[in-house]
Amino acid sequence: METLAVALQTEYLNKGATLVTQTKTSIPQQNGLPARAEAPKIPVLSLEEGYAYFEGRIVPMSAAKVSIATHALHYGTACFEGIRCYWNEQQQQLYLLKMREHFQRMENSWNVLRMRPKESIDELCRITLELVRMHGYRSDVYVRPITYKSSRTIKLTLSTLEDAVAIYAFPMGNYVDINAGLSVCTSSWRRANSNAMPVRAKVTGAYINSCLAVDDATATGFDEAIMLTHDGTVSEGSSCNLFVLRNGRLATPALSEDILEGITRNILIDLAMQEFGMTVEERRIDRTELYAADEIFMCGTGVQVSPVTSVDRRPVRTGKPGAFTMQLQQVYLSACRGENEKYKDWVTPVYE
């Protein structure tokens, strides 16, 4: 793969790959309904650019295609991860954040979906590192591994199907504005219960629950949705975990609140304790506690650490990003970029 990587990297760079963006068009107000707020530009990688790991090989993105008869396409029988790479300009180095932990979590998802792909976690880490390295990225990057039921059948089953892994990467900066503050709403769509849908696994089919919530939120002018459990307590954002600071105490919904066991969430719990001497409570949080919070922030691979400035059109205190949130964000990003020796074991350097 080493020789292939060099050749493909040269070809890719000579092509002068560019990042494409797409924007949803605003829909004017009709029949008394509010207009859909214009969505932020979301980075999209052209399928003619770059390379991917697909069916056991490194291939051009344009060749990484599945049949319309693929089981995962019909029934959502796939699981995925999102891994960020952070560029350090001073060190001229790109760092993969918690790569092994992401694949270990994917392995947990495999168990839920009765998957047995041929690649081991060690092999997937090596493939990911090589795939990112061969592109020669000198900016922040997002890596998307996905494992899916690749058999071509309409049968409702899991155990008897073939499994395949694919990985691709593309440049991506901030998914949302992490400094401005998010306007969020509590969604009418409840978070899927763990007894009905395995929310601790990142199963693709389960994300229709999130899509419904965030689409309704953005259609009515909000940036994000907060989802409640079937008991009415706070669960998480559409695709991110949530923290509440009140009276100097930091709290986050417990794992039993139908949340994804977030890797960023775990990092922030560690940082809050080690850098700020705080005790983090993992517990049930009532909806009204959001209205009484001193600070709220969301976290995840996509949103990173993003302050929330209003909930259901009620300002969070001053309606501006909280001081603690922004300090925690700064410490987090410093660790992600390999600037803090104490947390160097969290990151994997891409370039030798």
Residue ranges and their predicted role:
Residues 4-119, 123-130, 153-352:
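Helix-start/capping segments and mature chain N-termini
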Residues 135-137:
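Non-catalytic accessory segments adjacent to catalytic cores
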Residues 140-147:
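ATP-grasp fold ATP-binding core
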Residues 150:
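Active-site loop/lid in soluble adenylation, ligation, and acyl-transfer enzymes
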